Curated annotation (Swiss-Prot):
HAMAP family: Guanylate_kinase. This is Guanylate kinase. The keyword Nucleotide-binding applies. One of its GO terms (molecular function) is guanylate kinase activity. Belongs to the guanylate kinase family. Its main location: cytoplasm. It comes from Shouchella clausii (strain KSM-K16).
Length: 205
């Protein structure tokens, strides 16, 4: 009997909504979910490590990855490239393990066309004011960049309809529990299990 493939879980939302914080909290709970590391051309923030948080690339290196077809998706966001290396994602799913991608909304749209069977979760802020406060609190962006991110965030919230689920990140621990519940429910879906049990019935005949 063939092994059930893992889930591709795509978590995205506006910049500053807390995608990295939520994924970090999931990781700290030692869940069975694997984590895909994205590539980016943006500069590392304090505490970020190459190969752990991101693969930090030059524009030339990133553009070579695009040309070589090494990315599942990629997008340019506020002057920087972001993308998902494809090999690790495919190998993990084929091994029957779940993997979560923490990516920008623009990238999630591209993944949807390649992996329509993925589980797409939009992480939403409690309010736009709260989102702006979180971005300002980072202390890493200029006022112009903050305004640009807020304009983009409003456009991204309008794209919420392309997602399977919406999780409000009011409190990190609550958001984590909602995502875990979604993953559990997805593994119990009829369309994921029916083939397995039909094969079992055939073996018993």
């Amino acid at each position: 009997m063939k092994r059930e493939k893992g889930l591709l879980i795509v978590l995205s939302g506006p910049a500053g909504v807390g995608k990295g914080t939520v994924c970090g909290a999931l990781r700290n709970q030692n869940t069975a979910i694997e984590y895909s590391v994205s590539a980016t051309t943006r500069k590392p923030r304090e505490g970020e490590k190459h190969g752990v948080n991101y693969f930090f690339k030059t524009r030339e290196q990133f553009e070579q990855m695009i040309e070589d077809g090494k990315l599942l998706e990629w997008a340019e966001y506020v002057g920087n490239y972001y993308g998902t290396p494809i090999d690790y994602v495919q190998e993990t799913i084929n091994a029957g393990k779940d993997i979560i991608l923490e990516i920008e909304v623009q990238g999630a749209q591209k993944v949807r066309t390649v992996f329509p069977e993925g589980v797409f979760i939009f992480l939403a802020p409690p309010s736009l004011k709260e989102l702006r406060d979180r971005i300002v609190g980072r202390g890493t962006e200029t006022e112009d960049i903050i305004n640009e991110r807020m304009t983009v965030a409003k456009e991204e919230i309008d794209l919420m309809t392309m997602y399977d689920y919406v999780v409000e990140n009011d409190k990190v621990e609550w958001a984590v529990e909602r995502i875990k519940a979604i993953v559990t429910a997805e593994h119990c879906k009829r369309e994921r299990l029916i083939k397995k049990y039909k094969e079992l019935v055939e073996v018993e005949k």
